């Protein structure tokens, strides 16, 4: 009884320690308000966001149910967290229905909403509603066993799921369906005659732009609803959710009476594109920025690249591509061939701006070295090649302005409840007090500021979005409004502001247009708007001179850097009034949090742990270790339960299972959790087993892991796994029958194992190909194992340790050639090396197994192994082979693989080795006691993804391969034909 009490205290301590982690790692004093359908959980600093949901969530649910003509069946928690600094939200059924909202300032990607937080909630609520369109059977199942597993896991693709959300979010005139920047992706695909099939946008594609399943499915589902009504659409969902048809296409045909493929083709045919002018590189009206004299695209513009953050400065043009900032000197812009210079590498980038003089890059990036994602800013001194990190988070979209020869940093600060525009004076010589705040302005509710640019004289301009209304504002360094330019056309959406020679440049669109170019003459207060629709659109326009711009064109499968002469007849001028007074969108006084909400109370940490997943089977495993070896035997007859807090930080699980083979009962209790990313994760797992003689065994496992980003493209990963067992040994040599595996004696054994690994890795992309990566990983690993009999007589069987080293090198190409998009033939190579890899004893939890299976001598000791794989040829497929369902083919590859291994037969009384024992192994070599076995193979492989239900995701990719190999084992050459499967 005393032991049981201690165990309960330990479990309570652990659960209390990790009760608030993950997405609420720093939040205390959680509050809850229960509405008719939702439990809204939030920390005090999110009370304003909570107020929005308390007032609107129930109504949003009722409207959604009325739209689908379905009853309201569920109630679940909604968590609001301020910890995640990248605006988003998600719905999950694990381990019960729940929505988590990130209460932070949004980026331009959410410009399609006037009430961004509420609209994002409605998007996730649509997921919750459609995923829970259950019939009576699944409703009873949910009551008995919980919300997960759910039939949607095998029935609904991500494409279908997002089709419902994107179409619903747009039903009232906002949302992505009504946004021209979103439409651009579909329009451009149709312009290029490259419109995908339905299966191609089911979320199985690996290549960029890999998020297009949102857009294509959203417009398709909107088309279905408008042409055939919501009743049929709801029936399609109902049928698919309840698995009344095996495939999405089968359910569609039952409801609509014709094939999904035919509906998709009709939708593609009817999708309208605006009239496009004939300007192109081919006819010389547009120029390739890298080869302006050529009528064909340059290598840079035809290699599947994606360019961002194009900026013109007094020194020249900067842009970002594949992890690097590049520069083109202004004196080189008229050359017939232009080579961009690589400036520096950057990672986890959110935004990059450049000072007008071209001396500094201001980088907004995501910091992953924290329990949740943080947004930070660094300033890169281009001339001195020095990166200066600002030591605070919750800041973004920074840029430098210059006044009287001194620099000021302007940025958005969302570190508190109030979102502010801030201006700080920069002192590069003072490392301790690098920034000094000089002014700030509070943004009022539903107001967002983007694209800060220096316009000279200590003033800066930015795009101001208030609900769905845009304007261009000019502030001075004291955050006083100097001018505000209203836009001349209705429903204009503007982005990507830049400045050159007293002119502001921007991208714009309004209903029915492609993405066009606009300009503001700050001297004469004239706005000029392009009246042309150009294939690829005009993104990130920058002025080269008064009549020429450079820009990024977004084509269907790559972006291109182009430039174009601006003809006066293609521009329409508007004289606009400017306002030089305080705007209601901004305030000098901070807003206050709302008072305590009606029904608000303190949230109890364990309030939702009673909700979870109940499984009518045991997940307990009977482990045993002894002089005859180790065993793992399932105890499947039983019951299991798993739950977590509503924000998914900590999961608790328990299982009771019985196995007829061991005639024993096991109890498994565990907890796992940590940060919301790879910064820190843990698992604690306990198994206690009983048989007819009473207590049989107990084990405890503890796993810890952490990955910390260092420098720019590298990371340091640490993991430690400890395991302890004490108890009786199963009869491991028995044949499976009732009680056959039960221990033959009452002898008890103690087994201990600890494995530790440290890995430093560096990697960067060198091209568009999946194999175009260079980098390395290296690190030591240590394994300790101990086994002894503890009763009735103590006897040691194993006391072994091994310290080894692993390494990996990725070479992007052996041939100095660039491959065409979608093909690989420049021989990328990966090399792996293991020296005294600590994983070879029979008692290791993770026994490795060799690559080709030739080397089978269990007495042999692996000193080192070497593997090299060279891709001879690879081709991307990225297409479905069965139309609307079936398999999605990713790629096929032919490669050459070589594997070699050094083995020895060490003295029997030696059980511990490390890389410090090199002299001992040298002696073995001298005595010819080291043997080398190797194998070479040609591997034919192709990868596919099941395009069915929740399996339709690149994470579920399967690679099938066939090896034609020849092995040298001792003095024999052994041919082998081997078929294998690898999964992500």
Task: Report each predicted region and the residues it spans.
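Beta/coil-rich, acidic/histidine-enriched accessory regions frequently appended to metallopeptidases
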Residues: 22-23, 29-32, 211, 235-358, ...
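Outer-membrane beta-barrel initiation region
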Residues: 280, 294, 508, 560, ...
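C-terminal outer-membrane beta-barrel translocator/porin domains of Gram-negative envelope proteins
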Residues: 733-899, 904-932, 936, 971-973, ...
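Acidic/His/Gly-enriched intrinsically disordered linker/tail segments
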Residues: 25, 94-96, 109, 113-120, ...
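Juxtacatalytic substrate-recognition/specificity segment
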Residues: 20-151, 165
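Multi-bladed beta-propeller domains
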Residues: 277-305, 329-350, 379-402, 424-451, ...
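A flexible loop/linker signature enriched in serine peptidases of the S9 family
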Residues: 178, 320-326, 344-348, 364-377, ...
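Outer-membrane beta-barrel translocator/channel fold
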Residues: 512, 537-539, 556-558, 678-747, ...
């Amino acid at each position: 009884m005393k032991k049981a009490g201690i165990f309960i205290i330990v479990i309570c301590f652990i659960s209390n320690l990790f009760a608030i982690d993950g997405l609420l790692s720093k939040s205390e004093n959680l509050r809850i308000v229960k509405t008719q359908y939702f439990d809204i959980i939030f920390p005090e600093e999110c009370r304003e966001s909570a107020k929005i949901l308390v007032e609107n969530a129930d109504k949003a649910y009722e409207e959604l149910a009325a739209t689908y003509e379905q009853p309201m069946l569920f109630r679940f928690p909604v968590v609001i967290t301020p910890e995640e600094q990248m605006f988003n939200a998600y719905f999950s059924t694990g381990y019960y229905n729940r929505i988590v909202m990130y209460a932070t300032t949004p980026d331009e990607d959410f410009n399609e909403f006037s009430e961004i937080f509420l609209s994002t909630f409605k998007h996730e609520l649509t997921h919750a509603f459609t995923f829970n369109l259950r019939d009576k059977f699944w409703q009873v199942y949910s009551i008995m066993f919980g919300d997960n597993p759910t039939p949607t896991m095998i029935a609904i693709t991500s494409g279908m799921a997002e089709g419902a959300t994107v179409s619903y979010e747009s039903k009232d005139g906002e949302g992505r369906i009504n946004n021209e920047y979103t439409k651009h992706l579909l329009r451009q695909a149709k312009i290029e005659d490259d419109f995908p099939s339905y299966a191609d946008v089911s979320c199985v594609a690996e290549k960029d732009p890999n998020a297009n399943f949102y857009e294509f499915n959203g417009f398709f589902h909107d088309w279905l609803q408008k042409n055939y009504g919501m009743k049929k659409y709801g029936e399609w969902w109902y049928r698919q959710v309840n698995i009344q048809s095996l495939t999405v296409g089968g359910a569609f045909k039952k409801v609509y009476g014709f094939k999904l493929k035919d509906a998709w083709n009709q939708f593609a045919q009817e999708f309208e594109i605006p009239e496009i002018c004939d300007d192109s590189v081919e006819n010389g009206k547009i120029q390739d920025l890298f080869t302006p004299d050529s009528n064909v695209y340059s290598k840079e513009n035809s290699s599947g690249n994606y360019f961002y953050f194009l900026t013109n400065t007094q020194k020249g043009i900067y842009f970002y591509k594949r992890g690097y900032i590049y520069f083109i000197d202004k004196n080189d812009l008229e050359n017939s061939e232009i080579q961009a210079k690589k400036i520096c590498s950057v990672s986890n980038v959110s935004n990059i701006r450049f000072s007008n003089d071209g001396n500094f890059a201001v980088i907004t990036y995501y910091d992953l070295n924290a329990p949740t994602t943080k947004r930070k800013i660094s300033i890169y001194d281009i001339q001195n090649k020095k990166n200066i990190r600002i030591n605070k988070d919750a800041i973004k979209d920074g840029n430098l302005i210059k006044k009287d020869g001194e620099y000021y940093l302007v940025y958005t600060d969302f570190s508190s409840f109030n979102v502010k525009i801030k201006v700080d004076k920069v002192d590069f010589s003072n490392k301790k007090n690098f920034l000094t705040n000089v002014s700030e302005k509070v943004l009022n509710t539903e107001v967002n500021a983007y694209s800060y640019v220096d316009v000279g004289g200590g003033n800066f301009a930015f795009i101001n979005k208030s609900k769905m209304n845009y304007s261009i504002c000019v502030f001075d360094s004291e955050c006083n409004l100097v001018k505000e330019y209203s836009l001349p056309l209705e429903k204009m959406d503007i982005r990507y502001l830049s400045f050159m020679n007293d002119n502001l440049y921007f991208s714009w669109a309004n209903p029915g247009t492609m993405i066009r170019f606009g300009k503001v003459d700050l001297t004469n207060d004239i706005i000029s708007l392009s009246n042309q629709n150009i294939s690829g659109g005009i993104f990130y326009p920058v002025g080269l001179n008064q009549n020429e711009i450079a820009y990024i064109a977004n084509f269907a499968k790559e972006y291109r850097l182009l430039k174009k002469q601006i003809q006066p007849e293609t521009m329409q001028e508007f004289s606009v009034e400017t306002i030089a007074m305080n705007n209601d969108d901004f305030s000098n006084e901070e807003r206050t949090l709302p008072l305590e909400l009606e029904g608000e109370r303190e949230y109890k940490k364990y309030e939702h742990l009673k909700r979870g997943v109940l499984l009518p089977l045991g997940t307990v495993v009977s482990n045993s270790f002894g002089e005859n070896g180790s065993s793992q035997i399932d105890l499947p007859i039983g019951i299991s339960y798993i739950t977590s807090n509503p924000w998914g930080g900590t999961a608790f699980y328990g299982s009771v299972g019985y196995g007829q083979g061991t005639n024993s009962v096991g109890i498994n209790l565990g907890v796992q959790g940590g940060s919301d990313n790879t910064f820190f994760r843990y698992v604690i797992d306990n198994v206690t087993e009983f048989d007819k003689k009473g207590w049989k065994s107990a084990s405890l496992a503890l796993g810890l892991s952490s990955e910390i980003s260092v420098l720019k493209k590298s990371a340091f990963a640490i993991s430690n796994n400890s395991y302890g067992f004490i108890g009786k040994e199963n009869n491991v040599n028995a044949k499976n029958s009732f009680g056959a595996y039960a221990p033959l004696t009452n002898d008890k054994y103690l087994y201990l194992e600890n494995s530790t690994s440290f890995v430093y890795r560096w990697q960067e992309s060198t091209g568009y190909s999946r194999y175009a990566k260079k980098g390395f990983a290296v690190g030591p690993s240590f394994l300790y194992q101990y086994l002894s009999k503890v009763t009735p007589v103590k006897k040691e069987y194993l006391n072994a340790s091994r310290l080894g080293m692993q390494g990996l090198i990725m070479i992007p190409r052996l041939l100095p050639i660039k491959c065409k998009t979608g093909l690989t033939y420049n021989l990328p190579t990966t090399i792996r090396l293991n020296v005294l890899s600590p994983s070879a004893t029979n008692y290791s939890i993770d026994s490795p197994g060799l690559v080709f299976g030739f080397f089978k001598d269990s007495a042999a000791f692996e000193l080192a192994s070497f593997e090299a794989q060279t891709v001879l040829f690879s081709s991307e497929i990225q297409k479905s082979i069965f139309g609307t369902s079936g398999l999605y083919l990713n790629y096929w590859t032919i490669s050459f693989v070589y594997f070699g291994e050094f083995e020895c037969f060490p003295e029997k009384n030696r059980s511990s080795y490390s890389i410090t024992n090199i002299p001992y192994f040298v002696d073995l070599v001298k005595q010819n006691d080291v043997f080398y076995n190797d194998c070479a193979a040609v591997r034919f492989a192709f990868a596919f993804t099941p395009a069915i239900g929740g399996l339709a995701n690149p994470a579920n990719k399967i690679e099938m391969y066939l090896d034609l190999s020849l092995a040298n084992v001792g003095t024999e050459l052994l041919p082998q034909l081997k078929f294998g499967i690898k999964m992500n």
